[in-house]
Amino acid sequence: MAELFWFEKYRPRSFDEVVDLEEVKARLREFVRGGNMPHLLFYGPPGTGKTTMALVLARELYGEYWRENTLELNASDERGINVIRERVKEFARTAPVGKAPFKLVILDEADNMTSDAQQALRRIMEMYAQNTRFILLANYVSRIIDPIISRCAVFRFSPMPRSLMAERLRHIAKSEGIELRDDAIDLIYEVSEGDMRKAINLLQVAAATSKVVDANAVASATTMIRPADVVELFNLAFNGDVTKAREKLRELMYVKGIAGIDFIRAFQRELIRMPLDDEVKAEIAELLAEVDYRLTQGSDEELQLLYLLSKLGAIGKRARQTPPPSKRR
């Protein structure tokens, strides 16, 4: 049997297990206590807990009968609004199991539906409002038509803060017998950008080959440059060995497939930790910002990165010729 994805394995099953979204939880708890609720619209970036919260709400509403009373649909997977209409019709024609006054339809990626399909969805929501409630999940609320928004209680889901993501990742690592280093958490958070699903999946991939997960293990699990490679490339350029630095750069670009912008982000991340004078760090930071801007404007990646290495060599040469601040007086 294939190993369960950790994201599913550690998906919260109750409001108490959800480590974020306190305001959302408070309002949804009121619906559960009252035994009734309007249609709901959850929107926000991927991996911010929309599906998880919808399923938690179903469990809290229906208890052991939550599966019988819940229909999950994906607007992107279904073959048009007619299929959704027929499935909802079939689902809604029977009474809820247990004491619940209504059934629940969870429709993911609702913002991928056309305006015409959303108009049809609005009519479906009205048609079965007596015994069915809808939870619509969307990345972008701006892509949902106003007539649907006006019929829903709207909840915004934000990326998870670093502190809470770190807490959750440490819990999972401990449960799986994994030693999770702080630098790995930093890199996972940077790569995932607060997307908890992506963060947990990345942790699982990084842990597949080692019981100790550090930043290098995380980088190896992605197309990101490893911190060790960043330091090596920087030291080669900064110490004047531009030829080897170019060879290393081309290896990382064309063998490992590292993108130009990822080099810049990696240099910026490692620069903070490097044992350099503040003046030198400031000069390098300005250089990185310059190259970053050129890359965003569509300049050739290799040429810009070679320029970066050349300038790092010049900065390193000046730094070696300049006495430290304490000896300048």
Curated annotation (Swiss-Prot):
Residue spans crossing the bilayer: none
CDD domains from the UniProt entry: AAA, HLD_clamp_RFC
InterPro entries: AAA+_ATPase, ATPase_AAA_core, DNA_pol3_clamp-load_cplx_C, DNA_Rep/Repair_Clamp_Loader, P-loop_NTPase, Rep_factor-C_ssu_arc, Rep_factorC_C, RFC_lid
UniProt-listed GO biological process terms: DNA repair; DNA-templated DNA replication
Any one annotated GO CC term: DNA replication factor C complex
Pfam (any one): RCF1-5-like_lid
Gene3D superfamilies assigned to the protein according to its UniProt record, in alphabetical order: 1.10.8.60, 1.20.272.10, P-loop containing nucleotide triphosphate hydrolases
GO molecular function: ATP binding; ATP hydrolysis activity; DNA binding; DNA clamp loader activity
Keywords: ATP-binding, DNA replication, Nucleotide-binding
Binding positions (ATP): 44-51
Record carries keyword Nucleotide-binding: yes
Subunit structure: Heteromultimer composed of small subunits (RfcS) and large subunits (RfcL).
Family note: Belongs to the activator 1 small subunits family. RfcS subfamily.
Function per UniProt: Part of the RFC clamp loader complex which loads the PCNA sliding clamp onto DNA.
Protein name: Replication factor C small subunit 1
Organism: Pyrobaculum arsenaticum (strain DSM 13514 / JCM 11321 / PZ6)
Gene: rfcS1
